[in-house]
Amino acid sequence: TLDYAHTAPTYGLPGGKWVMSSLMVDDGIHDDGPLMTTAFEYKDGKRDRHEREFLGFGEVITKNLDTEKENALYRKSVQKYDVSGYYTQGNLVNASVEDAAGKVYTETRNEYDGYYLTAKGDEYTFTAQPVLCSDRASAFVPLRYTANLQYEGAAQGMITSEAWNEYYLTGHHGELKSYKFSNKGKLGSKGDGKFDYQTSIRYTSNSSRNILGLPTDVTVTGGDGKVYHQVSAVYDTKYPNHLTKITQQLGNGEAVTD
């Protein structure tokens, strides 16, 4: 059963918004436990007056209710989104799982970069821009850093894993250039700390046929500097996704597929 409600009008979202307020699932078997009921709460709705567009809610709370205890809250997940502007709308910046008392158990933090895009033919250049605000510019807002934390009810969380992304910003199209991963909590949001492994990617394109971003080399390097895995590919770029050869590292040798 779905239920809907209308949010209260605010300065950020005049007129409010019709939203799903609850979801009840009845599996038809009534002697094996209670019905599953989930309630939803929405905060910080934003309408861009300049663009005349709804940018979303800044916070969405999903509440798991105990139907055997008069729908008492026993767990909730909180998702926070960037609704500060047209270019960043919908970017998830924080997600957490909390108990009924508000103690955090897990948390995910995301950080993004903002770029203005200029094109010369089919070659793009991305220029870093801390604040994206323009009537005409094209923008690129990729995910740079993700950290996962475990709290288990404690006041301070412990980083259990981190990921950092780097992108091609000149002469390409914003493809992923490098990905770093760490489960030691020492990588950092700038990606300049210790990591477990790094994946580097190279691409080829045929702009005359609008065939772009075909990966030609994927190399996985450990934090110790050793190459642990490598795959290369060759394409007939006259046709989209026409793969002609794959070479994979296999021990001290190679495995080639034509």
Enumerate the predicted regions with their spans:
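Non-catalytic interaction/targeting regions
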Residues: 1-258
